[in-house]
Amino acid sequence: MTFMEFEKLRHGTELIKRGFARMQKGGVIMDVTTPEQARIAEEAGAVAVMALQAVPADLRKAGGVARMADPEIVQQIIDTVTIPVMAKARIGHFVEAEILEALGVDMVDESEVLTPADPFYHIDKTQFTVPFVCGARNLGEALRRINEGAAMIRTKGEAGTGDVSQAVKHMKQIQGEIRALAGKTKEELIMVAREIEAPIELVVETAKMQRLPVVNFAAGGVATPADAALMMRLGADGVFVGSGIFKAENPEKMAKAVVEAVNNYDNPAKLAEISKGVGAGMKGISADMIPVQEALQERGW
């Protein structure tokens, strides 16, 4: 495949953008803050890396305003690895997204991990040629983001905690709401669309497919190979790992183990071998201990 052919494949119409997102299915996407970390992620088998100024655990600890990563660092990461490079922009900050698109990132994450820029609106992602990924806690949030042009959805979870419980909650919430659509009449689906504030066309499509119209990855608190396998068993199309890699005792071993766990998520014996000797995971914090006003998952609507 030539460079130009790949450019056409990853950017463009909604169909092409969704197709590029689908190409990451079954893989692990890792948060990185430096070219060196990006290289570790690639060598471990990550399908893509996510560039940001600091991993969520550090952003949570530091407080203040969290913004997109320095474009120079993003460019260095792009130049360092051969796998796709994604980067985070603040909710509603379309200029950050435009800058990242101009840099040549493969996907933009309109992320609640960063400090939201717009208290009213998310980015109109249909105006971009680069695909977007967005977080969601329930079916309404997921379909609203897809209606805005998101090519991939991920659970919000509670980033930077190392506690997978919220990612589990959000994955089960979305899937439960999708199952509840089965067998409903058109009139009943219209009522559901009103209740969850989502376009009826997307509700009907989701009901027919019995899954989201785009890939749905797990994110937010995945910290061990077992966590990654759990999310795959629950129906995730792939896994984002943020602080769980580079806050672990041995990032290189943890990165490789998480990738292997996703590849062998339905094989307990293999998972047992994969999990041996990887070192301690990130210390983390229980998501239940975080006040609602400080929960990152509450950002966006």
UniProtKB/Swiss-Prot annotation:
UniProt-listed Pfam families: SOR_SNZ
Keyword annotations of the record: Lyase, Pyridoxal phosphate, Schiff base
GO MF assignments: pyridoxal 5'-phosphate synthase (glutamine hydrolysing) activity
Active site: K88 (schiff-base intermediate with d-ribose 5-phosphate)
GO biological process terms, semicolon-separated: amino acid metabolic process; pyridoxal phosphate biosynthetic process; pyridoxine biosynthetic process
Binding site for D-ribose 5-phosphate: D31, G160, G221, G242, S243
Family assignment from sequence similarity: Belongs to the PdxS/SNZ family.
NCBIfam families the UniProt entry points to: PRK04180.1 (NF003215), pyridoxal 5'-phosphate synthase lyase subunit PdxS (TIGR00343)
Quaternary context: In the presence of PdxT, forms a dodecamer of heterodimers.
Name this polypeptide is given: Pyridoxal 5'-phosphate synthase subunit PdxS
Species name: Methanosarcina mazei (strain ATCC BAA-159 / DSM 3647 / Goe1 / Go1 / JCM 11833 / OCM 88)
The encoding gene: pdxS
